[in-house]
């Protein structure tokens, strides 16, 4: 087994049939503090469309390896090595938030690999740091006291009032051993390298193939004034809005998200 397959955990979903056009690869990249599990339900739907779906846990997330190194450049190299090791020569990519930034950098660095790109609720611009309260809450959890799941959620609720956001973070909680919970993500590294998350796409990065940006109607991650910058980096792009949802579009309205992405990928 290639070393990258041991380092990067992935969920692989194979279609039940081979379409006339042949099986196409689809890569799905989660957002900051997320993991592949967040995308399994949608992944199964894409597989039913004839895609070979690979949902990755990016470094320092989920069941993938922990490393002191954490940047978009490193994540792109991880994904590139994974694609090479798994014979994913031509792929489409769906990336949400941090995974969307990773997907943008991958597509502009290795455009020959990528057929179509879908970016969910993130733009190529710089984002100021805004995860302080989430990190503060996560750092307040003292696992040496062996808290229960309910106690962990109670601590987080003091810093993260949004129930959906807490449930999203709780998915990364697991039993490290009987009676001992832990987070799967590498909180220690995020504490010191959180500024990496906000970094912009390099100014000269361009991807000329079909690209779909999907933003949440209640989210402020992609604003109308960002359209010009998006078009500069992605000339063959369009920007769609899912009404009445926030940043986690795929979780808040999975049906519409699937319809929009499936139609674009055909």
Region locations from a protein language model:
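Serine-hydrolase catalytic-loop signature spanning alpha/beta hydrolases and amidase-signature enzymes
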Residues: 33-41
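Gly/Ala-rich beta-loop-alpha elbow adjacent to hydrolase catalytic centers
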Residues: 95, 99, 103
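Catalytic active-site module of serine/aspartate enzymes centered on a nucleophile-bearing elbow/loop
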Residues: 237-266
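Conserved alpha/beta-hydrolase catalytic His-Asp/Glu region
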Residues: 129, 144-201
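Active-site loop/oxyanion-hole signature of alpha/beta-hydrolase fold enzymes
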Residues: 14, 43-48, 52-94, 259
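Alpha/beta-hydrolase fold catalytic core
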Residues: 1-27, 48-51, 88-89, 195, ...
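Conserved serine/cysteine hydrolase catalytic core
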Residues: 177-233, 238-241
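Flexible "cap/lid" loop of the alpha/beta hydrolase fold
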Residues: 104-108, 115-147
